[in-house]
């Protein structure tokens, strides 16, 4: 599966409900972070530390990233 194939329903099934949500798919404002344009961001805190970040633009997933406890960030392969 690629990030572009990930839907909101599949993300909830795979990762659960996010711990934090910033923006929403209907928000007309777009932001850019880590080279990704988005208007909704889901943040999951990981048990081993760090977090998983899922970026959405409208209903399209724009990328999934994993932040390590040391703050380094890598795109997650789905």
List each language-model region with its residue ranges:
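Residues within mature, well-folded domains
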Residues: 1-78
């Amino acid at each position: 599966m690629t990030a572009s194939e990930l839907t909101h329903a599949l993300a909830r099934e795979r990762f659960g409900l996010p711990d934090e949500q910033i923006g929403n798919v209907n928000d007309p404002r777009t932001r850019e972070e880590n080279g990704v344009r988005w208007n909704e961001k889901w943040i999951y805190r990981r048990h081993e530390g760090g977090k998983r970040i899922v970026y959405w633009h409208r209903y399209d997933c724009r990328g999934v990233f994993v932040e390590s406890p040391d703050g380094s960030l890598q795109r997650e392969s789905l």
